[in-house]
Amino acid sequence: AALEKVAIKCSVENLADKTDITLPGTLFNRALKVEQKIAEGDAVRIRLGYDRILRDEFSGYVSEIATDNDSVRIHCEDELYKFRKDLKDRVLKSVTVKTLLTSVAEEVGKYEVACDYDFTYDNFTIHAATGYDVLRKVQSETKANIYLRGKTLHVHPQYAQIGEKVIYDFAVNIEKSDLKYRDASKRKFLAVVEGTDAKGKTIRIERGTT
């Protein structure tokens, strides 16, 4: 087997889910000529599991191939890789975030847009940028969850979309714990939540005591 390591990074805080595939630089004393068989933009699907029971863990595209000492690293991104296309330079005035993203999605690849935000930019300049750059700017300013599902670009506030429930089991998926019993009257808890609403306003809520 020529595979050294696979690292999958999935987080709503990142614009795109990413995977690094590490291969040895040589195999049986021969250099692996990866660039002759794999190219940027090639589709990638990763399936992992046990006892030949596999499930899909990642699908996307090769974004970069690099050498790292004696290894070859293949960097991959999920479907949002398709937005790494150059856009026409332009300045959009009094444009809502949904109209902006609809314009970008249309130019990149005829994508639909499902967006919960309705605030307006006075001016939004696109210069020497890709569709991915625009998505990253919008995410950095709104903290939105942005992802592709089929031909629809989704843009939603954090926690607006609830995924599957996860069950944590000490015998199954908890590697380490440091739990301590405390009397209810002595437990102090302070929760601070910050977010951006659909109109672009920053909201901060504190609950609890320290």
Where are the model-predicted features located?
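Short, well-structured beta-strand/strand-turn elements
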Residues: 109-116, 142-152
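Short, charged, solvent-exposed linker or helix-capping segments at domain edges/interfaces
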Residues: 33, 85-89, 165-168
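Short beta-strands and strand-coil junctions in structured, solvent-facing domains, enriched
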Residues: 28-29, 82, 143-145, 162, ...
